[in-house]
Design a protein with these regions (language model features):
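Short conserved catalytic/interaction loops centered on acidic-Pro-aromatic/His motifs
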Residues: 125-128, 135-136
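Active-site beta-strand-loop-beta-strand hairpin of nuclease catalytic cores
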Residues: 118-126
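Short, flexible active-site-adjacent loop segments at beta-strand->alpha-helix junctions, enriched
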Residues: 10, 120, 130
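Basic, Lys/Arg-enriched alpha-helical interface segments
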Residues: 1-111, 133-135, 139-175
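Short acidic loop-to-beta-strand element that houses the catalytic metal-binding Asp/Glu
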Residues: 113-116
Length: 175
């Protein structure tokens, strides 16, 4: 549950999705391999052709995003960071799919995304994250996998009647 404690509940069990994401985004070899494999997307959408530039930008954004997410100051507001997954959605929904990313990044938009299910205002369950180099998540296997994972987690929460923080805490006590 996120309100500055992060974990993901999935049918396969609990793990710290946030730690996994940031470990990956700070692994230079993993980033090098990822950007080499996705250089066409990086060049066409972001106009970046140097893998080293992409790695540097990712490390910088990852650090900033981690600081924003883990900010435990009284003024911290996760609702300012997370936005509806669908850019066209403006209404509140039960267990809505959300995304977080760095806003107002110089030179180009941030490609880092953290995906979560919103339990209630200020309370999120992180389901994963990705480097999104295309306009939609459906265009690439790794982002489509995150989309499917979000839906699996959402369906799991619905099936187990975990629709708010209290129900989440009760569910964890039963494990």
């Amino acid at each position: 549950l996120i309100s500055h404690k992060f974990s993901t509940v999935a049918p396969s069990g609990c793990f710290n999705a946030l730690a996994t994401i940031f470990d990956q985004w700070n692994d230079i070899q993993w980033l090098h391999d990822f950007f080499k494999a996705n250089i066409d997307d990086l060049a066409s959408y972001f106009k970046i052709t140097d893998v080293n530039d992409a790695i540097y930008d990712t490390l910088e954004d990852s650090d900033k995003l981690e600081c924003l997410i883990l900010d435990i100051s009284p003024d911290a507001d996760l609702d300012e960071l997370f936005r509806p997954l669908e850019n066209s959605r403006f209404d509140e929904r039960l267990l809505s799919k959300e995304k977080a990313r760095i806003q107002n990044r110089p030179h180009h938009a941030s490609w880092l995304r953290i995906y979560a299910i919103k339990l209630e205002p200020g309370k999120y369950i992180v389901t994963g994250g990705a480097i999104k180099l295309t306009a939609t998540m459906q265009e690439r296997e790794h982002t489509l996998r995150e989309l499917h994972n979000m839906e699996k987690v959402r369906q799991f929460l619905v099936a187990n009647q975990v629709i708010d923080e209290d129900a989440f805490v009760d569910y964890l006590k039963e494990l």
